Amino acid sequence: MKMTKTYLLVAIALLFTSTSFAELSIKSDVIYGHKDGMALVYSVLQPENANGAAIVFMVSGGWFSRWSPAQRYASRFDDMLDAGFTVIPVHHGSAPRYRVPEAYADVSRAIRHIKLHAGQHGIDPDRIGVTGGSAGGHLSLMLGMDSDAGINGDRDEVMRNSNDVAAIVAYFPPVDLREITGPNDRFPALDFEPAKAAAISPILHADPTDPPILLIHGDADELVEISNSVDMQAEFEKQHITSEFVTIPGAGHGFRGEDATQAAAMRLDWFKRYLL
């Protein structure tokens, strides 16, 4: 009897899963490059009512980029999909093997690849936003502040494409890696040459050409202190960059419950405002 109930629950779960994704097109594990013989991948989730804009999600926490089935992102980002956005979760070379500079190089390449194949993905290459939290927020900011129009003459077709983005939403991002680079048991991706830290510290790269940026941070964050976003917003204002900074009172690192709902609503509104 117990086994029968288990099978019944599994069957019901599969039924609802199939129903939920019936109007969603999913391309899983699109290869955008290779590293040490391993594929670098992203997935493309496109709703039936696609509006042509895309939101790229940085799959990164502590610069660990753990693979998950693409279908899991359908429920995580159902608000974006319902609004017609194509959602593209990107995986980079993960800690502990790879360091932050390598992770950034990977996601930068991913944006170029997405733009190169924008027609195949049914998106407008000029209406791509990017978002992430913590390490993913850091990578999102770097993509907005360290972009170029493509590397002319590069033998790699992907690298000849731009890596710029049109809007950014970053949750609780570390913005100055000069202060935290070095041996680190918890976050091994930070163990790289200190001389490279400035090149991947968003606080040092803001300029008036940067896209609109929304920062969301909890004032009870003990891992990435809110001063990171305070300082980043001050730099945005100094550079006259279109930006907003929202503090969520009492929220720690990683929004949950009502805090997560509130942050997601603000994120969606930002992308509607600047991508549509």
Where are these regions (language model features)?
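N-terminal cap/lid segment of alpha/beta-hydrolase-fold proteins
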Residues: 23-50
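Primarily recognizes the serine-hydrolase "nucleophile elbow" in alpha/beta-hydrolase
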Residues: 112-181
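C-terminal catalytic histidine-bearing segment of alpha/beta-hydrolase fold enzymes
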Residues: 43, 226, 230-276
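Short beta-strand element of the alpha/beta-hydrolase
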Residues: 52-61
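Alpha/beta-hydrolase active-site loop
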Residues: 98-119
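Short amphipathic alpha-helix adjacent to the substrate-entry channel of hydrolases
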Residues: 69-88
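Short beta-strand/loop motif that positions the catalytic acidic residue
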Residues: 215-217, 221
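Mobile cap/lid helix-loop segments that gate and shape the active-site cleft of serine hydrolases
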Residues: 144, 173-205, 211
